[in-house]
Amino acid sequence: MSRHICWICKLCRDESKRLPSNLTLDEVLKWAQSLESLMATKYGPIVYTAYLKLEHSDENIKFWMACETYKKIASRRGRISRAKKLYNIYIQPQSPREINIDSTTREAIIKSIREPTQTCFEEAQKIVYMHMEMDSYPRFLKSEMYQQLLKTVQSQSS
């Protein structure tokens, strides 16, 4: 991902007008339709994560993406291992990347951590998604990063 962030940072600092050749105006405009639309595109999650990283608030997107990966783990052993990692990084109080969830949701995860199901983080993931949708996503659309990227893509497509 660092390779992608590099072109994003250069663009935002106005040092580069080069974008990935397959980043289209259509894709960048889709990002403004909804967070769901942004997350369904190739570069949307990369750019959004870079923005959140600049804001020092990328724990929500990282947790959300980690949950998407977690849900695909079929083996019990793999699920237990990954669930413990997710707990230690994002759920445990005072953890380095602790996400903002209510105590009921946190307690439900703590109870299920020994025998985690594929859906044990689902409620926390929904809460985090709602936080992004209502808070950081609207800020992203107004950000200099998004506006500069949109302007550059528009100028290259005309």
Swiss-Prot record:
It comes from the Eukaryota. It holds the Pfam family RGS. Keywords: Signal transduction inhibitor. InterPro entries: RGS (IPR016137), RGS_sf (IPR036305), RGS_subdom1/3 (IPR024066), RGS_subdomain_2 (IPR044926). GO terms for cellular component: cytosol; nucleus; plasma membrane. Residues 34-150 form the RGS domain. Coiled coil: none annotated. GO terms for biological process: G protein-coupled receptor signaling pathway; negative regulation of G protein-coupled receptor signaling pathway. Inhibits signal transduction by increasing the GTPase activity of G protein alpha subunits thereby driving them into their inactive GDP-bound form. Binds to both G(i)-alpha and G(q)-alpha. PANTHER family: REGULATOR OF G PROTEIN SIGNALING, REGULATOR OF G-PROTEIN SIGNALING 13. This is Regulator of G-protein signaling 13. It comes from Mus musculus (Mouse). The gene is Rgs13.
